[in-house]
Every structure is written in C-alpha cells, then in structure tokens.
Amino acid sequence: MRDLILVGGGLANGLIAWRLRQRYPQLNLLLIEAGEQPGGNHTWSFHEDDLTPGQHAWLAPLVAHAWPGYEVQFPDLRRRLARGYYSITSERFAEALHQALGENIWLNCSVSEVLPNSVRLANGEALLAGAVIDGRGVTASSAMQTGYQLFLGQQWRLTQPHGLTVPILMDATVAQQQGYRFVYTLPLSADTLLIEDTRYANVPQRDDNALRQTVTDYAHSKGWQLAQLEREETGCLPITLAGDIQALWADAPGVPRSGMRAGLFHPTTGYSLPLAVALADAIADSPRLGSVPLYQLTRQFAERHWRRQGFFRLLNRMLFLAGREENRWRVMQRFYGLPEPTVERFYAGRLSLFDKARILTGKPPVPLGEAWRAALNHFPDRRDKG
C-alpha cells in the first residue's frame, strides 16, 4: 500500500509530489497521469511577488525562463512594469519530475474511480493508499457561473532576432473580437517567441484555425518573420463570476483535491501556479498525510481562498456583464494605469482595502448603471456563497 497516490499529473499534483520528495524522500508516493507525460503541453507563468522567497527557492529548478519585468499595451496606455516574471515549461516540469520520482510516475494510465483511500484503474486494478489526492483538472459544475479565457499559443523560431527583452503580457491594441481580446508574447530566446491569442468570452467556443491565423497575422504586423513552428498549446480556463464552493466539493465526499479540481486558480487572470505552490507547502507542512486530515486541509484551503476572492468575482461580473463587448478592454486599461504595487498585489490575490478602493473609484470604464447591475448579479440565488 502506498502512503499517497496523486491522480492527475498536472501542475498542482506535480508540485505536491516535487515538494514532498524534497521534504520526505522516503515517502512512498505514486503519481498517475492519463497522458504521455506529466504536465501535458503547457506553459505556467507567475509574478515575482506571487511567491515568498522560500517558495522561489524550492521552485527554482523547475523555472525555465525569467525576465526582469514585463509590458502591457492598450490603445491609450503603454507601460513597462519592473517586477520579475517567470515561466515553467511542461518539458522542464516533466524532466524534473521524472528525475525526482523515477518509476513512481505511471503514464498513459486511465483511472475510473477515485475514493479517499483507493484508486481503481480503467483496467479494473485497485490500488490502496493512506490517502488519494484528485488533481485531474477542472470539471464542469452547476455550482459555478463562469466566463472563459480561451487561448491558442504557438512557439515560433524566427529568421532573425525579435528584439524583445521582456514579455508583453497584454497587447490589447489588436482588434477586439469575441469579448476582451489581447495577444500575450514571451521571448524564450533571442529568436524564439511564444505568441498567444487570448479572449475573455462568455461561451467556451474556440476556433483554433482562426486563432492560428491571428497569431500569424500578429507576428507579421510586428515584422517578425516566422521560420519554424516548434510547439502549439491551447486552453479554455474558467473565469469565476459567482457560485457555491461547498456545492463544488459535495460531489466527491471525503476525497482530497488539488489545483483546478479544487477551484484553486486566480478568479480573474486564471493563473494557477501561486495557489498550487501554496497548497504544496501546506501539505508538506502537515503533520498527518492520511485521507481525513488531507481532505480537511485541502477543502479548508479552497474555502479560505474562495472567501478571500469575492472582490475579484465582482470585478469579473463587471468585465463580462457590463458594457459592450468591444469596449471591455477599457476596464483592463484603467486597471494597468494604477500604481505598480496595486497591480502586483492584484496578481498575487492580496489586494488591500485601499487597493480595492483605487480600482472602483474614479471615472468608470463601463457605464455606471450597467456596472452596478453586473456587480450585483449573483448566481444562482443571488447569494455568492462562501
């Protein structure tokens, strides 16, 4: 019998395994992944102030790229922010986990049932453990009302250097389509870029062929000559408007959860790495790793996060439900004009009361009446439950 089985080899469970291996190298754990490698095909990014110095230290071997700042671009605002920005690639992530866990990673392994102390594989085999953590990604739930962040990114090698020294996190000078749209660009080397077309949309419908064309068009508009496509990634992330966190957890009683499965992501940006790191630390610090204490720990962690993020869900309702779709960029342009510490605390999910007042006061970027109606539009019974 294993001490711990982690079902799903994505970011959250991978970081839990990585941290536990650092802290407790003799722990008998197993990571089960349905795909061909842990981490799938993704790029996870985060801001310098999202993590503590200690967290930066234990995560450092996984970081593939680091920059001293980043830029944002809007029709009436162009700004460079001077705080660090970092990215982990799924290739680096998988390599590190294989080195740390060895044969304790099972790939191409489908699971049919997850219980607090056991896992049943698709072939019928049953595995027992002191605890099981379900980290198989986001699942559709009637307990949540969401918008969506849709994206397609392509990693291109260029014919010549691109000249970028820092990422462009948002270029919203592009034509606005399907809600709020921007292009996200990471300079991975002197002649390699990850270019990602992103839309905040009301429905989870993504036209990949159209997005491939817009990525190509954007590169050409910048004078970047594309030589070789090295990789492509796609995604559809939930952007939470309102919901009931207790109902979200009710469909699998007693089973500890992690990551998107637990509702652990930034409600507005969709970033999930900072919370995955924090949960990994909390689990590694726990004196007991049985199913009951881990269920209590992970559920309480998720519920605390939910209660703290009500302001972000309010902002999301204003972004998705107020004003014309083609003008939603104005909300983000106004936000990025705020003082840099406020922007960094926003990404870290640690806004002060003064920060919240800064965001809500001043000339509204969407019609005031519509903004307040959207802010008060709760789901499903006009109570945003914590």
UniProtKB/Swiss-Prot annotation:
| Cofactor entry | FAD
Q: Give the Enzyme Commission number.
A: 5.5.1.19
Catalytically driven reaction(s): a carotenoid psi-end group = a carotenoid beta-end derivative; all-trans-lycopene = gamma-carotene; gamma-carotene = all-trans-beta-carotene
Which InterPro entries does the protein's record reference? CrtY, FAD/NAD-bd_sf, Lycopene_cyclase_b/e
A single GO molecular-function term is:
lycopene beta cyclase activity
Which Pfam families does the record cross-reference, listed alphabetically? Lycopene_cycl
Where does the chain bind NAD(+)?
3-33
Which SUPFAM superfamilies does the entry mention?
FAD/NAD(P)-binding domain
Which pathway is recorded for this entry?
Carotenoid biosynthesis; beta-carotene biosynthesis
Please provide the record's keywords in A-Z order.
Carotenoid biosynthesis, FAD, Flavoprotein, Isomerase, NAD, NADP
The processes (GO biological process) annotated in the record are: carotenoid biosynthetic process
Please give the positions of the paired cysteines in each disulfide bond. Answer: none
Give the protein's function: Catalyzes the double cyclization reaction which converts lycopene to beta-carotene.
Family classification: Belongs to the lycopene cyclase family.
Q: What is this protein called?
A: Lycopene beta-cyclase
Q: Which organism is it from?
A: Pseudescherichia vulneris (Escherichia vulneris)
Lineage here is: Bacteria, Pseudomonadati, Pseudomonadota, Gammaproteobacteria, Enterobacterales
Q: Report the gene name.
A: crtY
